[in-house]
UniProtKB/Swiss-Prot annotation:
This is Spermine oxidase. FAD binds at A35, E55, R63, T79, W80, V261, E519, T528, T529. SUPFAM superfamilies: FAD-linked reductases, C-terminal domain, FAD/NAD(P)-binding domain. It is an enzyme of class 1 (oxidoreductase). Binds 1 FAD per subunit. Belongs to the flavin monoamine oxidase family. Its cofactor is FAD. Residues 274-291 have a biased composition (Basic and acidic residues). Induction: By antitumor polyamine analogs. One of its GO terms (cellular component) is nuclear membrane. It holds the Pfam family Amino_oxidase. One of its GO terms (biological process) is xenobiotic metabolic process.
Amino acid sequence: MQSCESSGDSADDPLSRGLRRRGQPRVVVIGAGLAGLAAAKALLEQGFTDVTVLEASSHIGGRVQSVKLGHATFELGATWIHGSHGNPIYHLAEANGLLEETTDGERSVGRISLYSKNGVACYLTNHGRRIPKDVVEEFSDLYNEVYNLTQEFFRHDKPVNAESQNSVGVFTREEVRNRIRNDPDDPEATKRLKLAMIQQYLKVESCESSSHSMDEVSLSAFGEWTEIPGAHHIIPSGFMRVVELLAEGIPAHVIQLGKPVRCIHWDQASARPRGPEIEPRGEGDHNHDTGEGGQGGEEPRGGRWDEDEQWSVVVECEDCELIPADHVIVTVSLGVLKRQYTSFFRPGLPTEKVAAIHRLGIGTTDKIFLEFEEPFWGPECNSLQFVWEDEAESHTLTYPPELWYRKICGFDVLYPPERYGHVLSGWICGEEALVMEKCDDEAVAEICTEMLRQFTGNPNIPKPRRILRSAWGSNPYFRGSYSYTQVGSSGADVEKLAKPLPYTESSKTAPMQVLFSGEATHRKYYSTTHGALLSGQREAARLIEMYRDLFQQGT
């Protein structure tokens, strides 16, 4: 897009007046994750020249975090490309040679599934026993049948019996238990094992949905999340390579690192003719959750505008710089919005959007990597899954803080060892993950080693030589891993979260001042990397289309 001229002299709205003076709209993107980079790149490719990306942390990538240890790359954040057919992340990775060559058989398997017979997942009890393979397969088939039923409530508009039953966890637990108890062929001992396995599978589901518990995931909305067909893939060189490819077309000066935002002052033009409508702040009014750059009661300092200029939005940064803009694309996580929405936007958000932020869910899923000198597991083993026999009748997935380790569902074996060494990757989610994040490495390594000894029945397992783990819940720039539709929410809330501000159209009010993207704003693909990327492109497309309609290209 070249510099723009109004298509009619009568246009006197704020955007038209600004463009007559400047020729280009100014867009500020908050966040340099997949959504933010995708939005910035799309705008730049369409000729927008006044684009700035503000990233709070010291690096781009957001919830993509690839860590190099020795010759191997480990993913603390996004790990898999979920599906291939029409997945923009997959096509970007494939076009740039980032994917491994796989056989047809490997393509059909995709990533290791804990719910299938592919590979050898070792299900172990806290008494040091391995659950027989036939019992695991029977339970897996049963669980999959019930899992498919959970999809039908949304897809076939099936009514939920009661609001208290509008929970994936409650429905699944009760349905699977009833089928196990009513099976005339299983002896009581086998039934007890299968009943205990329910909780383990629900822990895995909770990790995959990034909820504290599947009891908190809406049954009526669960089936709206859409899986892209095709195999799941990892990127051996690291998921950050996708981020780097996105950033390649973005000039270095566009992205500012270490630049946390304190507040977005929007609807400025309709409130006063010029200058930022920013009230002085005291200590009590300062938002303390936006990182270390906070300046307390320090007065904001002037930003990048002429005093005679008029801007709809002013972005106030933690270093007190004020950046005026025509449009701001907000890509911060739902966790950050939940924690900071009251102080992050002035004026405050509309009631409808606040309600959507409250209703939608986001939790923490963390990984624990343990590296050993030698493997203590067999070459055929692809994972060690932990089944607590005393949880056969349990109705909760919440544990006291001192028992946080019970939420670890198991450890996957990273393959091949030639690439990773002898490494196990553990999974934990929810409030228990937050407790784990507060522990030091030594304590977590010790507890995990004791669990491995207990469940394998091998007291001689040594402590790992190295531990690496994520901490998404306590990171002030994320406050969680990814979103889900919580009980009481629906896809309509995702749409409300994504709706640009202001809601009303007026000749005195500039449109699309604040736009929202990020995985939590994609109705079908929330929680995924492709959902994040597509949401960034979606918001860029809104602006591209608006300026295409409002203005003709200049020469």
